[in-house]
C-alpha cells in the first residue's frame, strides 16, 4: 500500500518486526541501529553484577523497610572482583563493551560466541561448557534466535560453580526459567541478576521474583537518556553513509 516508500529505519538492533526480504524485493532499503544502547546495557550489566554479589539492592530495600540486614544468602562467599572470572555468552557490541569495562575490575574474561571471528580483545575464547564450568559470573549478551532459544537449561546450569552468579540483561528466551528457578531455589548456584523475564511484568508471585537470592529490575538496562537521544543519530548516520 506504500507505493512511494523507499526506506525503512528501525530504531533498534533487531529487525524482527520488519519483513526485510519482502521489503528488499520491493526495492525498499532497510536500516537498523545495532549497538544503539550498547553503552547503556554494558554499564547496567556491571551494576547488576555488583548489586547481586554485594547485596546492594537488598541492603537498600532492607533499610527502606526499617531493617538493618547484615546476613544475606551469599554471606559466606561474598566475592571481590579482582581475580574472578566472568564468562560472556555473546560477543557483539554489548559483550565487547562489557569485556572492556571488566578490565578495570582486574577480572579474567571468558567468551563464547559461535559466530565470533578471531579472538576476544582481552579475554579468552572457549566453548560454552568450559565457560560455564570456570566462570564465577555468567553474563548473557546474545541475540535471541530460533537456534539458541533456551540455550541455558538444567544441564547448562548444573555445570556452573555452586558459588557462581547468573546475569541476564539480554533476552529471557535464552533461558529455561523453570530450570533457573530450580537451580537458585536448590542453591546449585549462588545467585542471579535479571532484567528480563519470559512474562513481563512478572508480578510479585512470579517464581523468580519470590527468591531471596535474585536481584531483579524491570527491563531497564538499555534505558539511558543518552541511548534514547543517540539512536536517531546513529540511524541517520547509517543512512547517510549508504548515500541516502
Model-predicted regions and their roles:
Residues 30, 163-244:
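Rossmann-like dinucleotide-binding domain for NAD(H)/NADP(H)
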Residues 11-12, 28-39, 170, 219:
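Short beta->alpha connector loops at strand-helix junctions that form conserved
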Residues 1-31, 133, 153-155, 159:
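An N-terminal-biased, well-structured beta-alpha scaffold segment characteristic
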Residues 1, 18-25, 115-122, 202-210:
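Short loop/helix-cap segments at secondary-structure boundaries that form the rim of catalytic
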Residues 74-162:
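Rossmann-like dinucleotide/phosphate-binding beta-alpha-beta segment
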Residues 2-5, 106, 135, 163-164, ...:
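Short, well-ordered alpha-helix to beta-strand connector turns
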Residues 34-85:
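Phosphate-binding beta-alpha-beta segment of Rossmann-like dinucleotide-binding domains, i.e.
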